[in-house]
């Protein structure tokens, strides 16, 4: 190997050239790679944070759903109890109302029965008085003849009873 040879110097020049170009390019490439690595790390951290936030939000939502289910169950249970109580109260009110109406109807029927009975008795008495009056008027009997007839009948009854004792 000869130091004066052109290919030798060309090779050394090329190596120096590559070294000189590579050195500043190396810094630029390393800086670009470091920037990309930092960006990727930030994105990974953001993704991890988003994942943690999503998991936390999922758990919170899950707890809220459980609370809502519990609340819904309680509301349904309370509404069932309230409905049953309302039904019982209204049934009791209806029964009391019907009992009052029944008692009122019975009382009304009894009042009407009493009124009708009294009316019939009054009508019957009026009719008897009218018939007796007509009878006495048609027979044209005076008070004396009525009294005489009654006396005669009572004497007849006394005579019959004496006659029965004698026999």
Curated annotation (Swiss-Prot):
Transmembrane segments: 7-25
Membrane topology: Single-pass membrane protein
Disulfide bonds: none
Any one annotated GO CC term: plasma membrane
Location within or outside the cell: Cell inner membrane
One MF annotation (Gene Ontology) recorded for this entry: proton-transporting ATP synthase activity, rotational mechanism
Keywords in alphabetical order: ATP synthesis, Cell inner membrane, Cell membrane, CF(0), Hydrogen ion transport, Ion transport, Membrane, Transmembrane, Transmembrane helix, Transport
Keyword Cell inner membrane on entry: yes
Family matches, as InterPro entries: ATP_synth_b/b'su_bac/chlpt
Task of the protein: F(1)F(0) ATP synthase produces ATP from ADP in the presence of a proton or sodium gradient. F-type ATPases consist of two structural domains, F(1) containing the extramembraneous catalytic core and F(0) containing the membrane proton channel, linked together by a central stalk and a peripheral stalk. During catalysis, ATP synthesis in the catalytic domain of F(1) is coupled via a rotary mechanism of the central stalk subunits to proton translocation.
UniProt cross-references to HAMAP family, sorted A to Z: ATP_synth_b_bprime
Family that this chain belongs to: Belongs to the ATPase B chain family.
Record's subunit section: F-type ATPases have 2 components, F(1) - the catalytic core - and F(0) - the membrane proton channel. F(1) has five subunits: alpha(3), beta(3), gamma(1), delta(1), epsilon(1). F(0) has three main subunits: a(1), b(2) and c(10-14). The alpha and beta chains form an alternating ring which encloses part of the gamma chain. F(1) is attached to F(0) by a central stalk formed by the gamma and epsilon chains, while a peripheral stalk is formed by the delta and b chains.
Protein name: ATP synthase subunit b
């Amino acid at each position: 190997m000869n130091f004066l040879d052109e290919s030798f110097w060309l090779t050394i020049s090329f190596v120096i050239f590559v070294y000189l170009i590579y050195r500043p390019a190396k810094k630029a490439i390393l800086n670009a790679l470091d920037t990309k690595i930092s960006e990727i790390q930030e994105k990974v951290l953001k993704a991890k944070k988003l994942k943690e936030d999503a998991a936390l939000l999922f758990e919170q939502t899950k707890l809220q759903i459980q609370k809502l289910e519990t609340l819904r169950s309680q509301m349904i249970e309370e509404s069932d109890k309230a409905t049953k109580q309302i039904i019982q109260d209204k049934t009791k009110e209806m029964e009391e109302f019907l009992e009052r109406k029944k008692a009122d109807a019975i009382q009304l029927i009894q009042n009407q029965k009493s009124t009708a009975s009294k009316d019939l008795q009054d009508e019957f008495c009026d009719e008897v008085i009218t018939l007796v009056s007509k009878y006495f008027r048609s027979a044209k009997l005076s008070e004396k003849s009525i009294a005489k007839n009654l006396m005669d009948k009572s004497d007849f009854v006394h005579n019959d009873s004496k006659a029965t004792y004698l026999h």
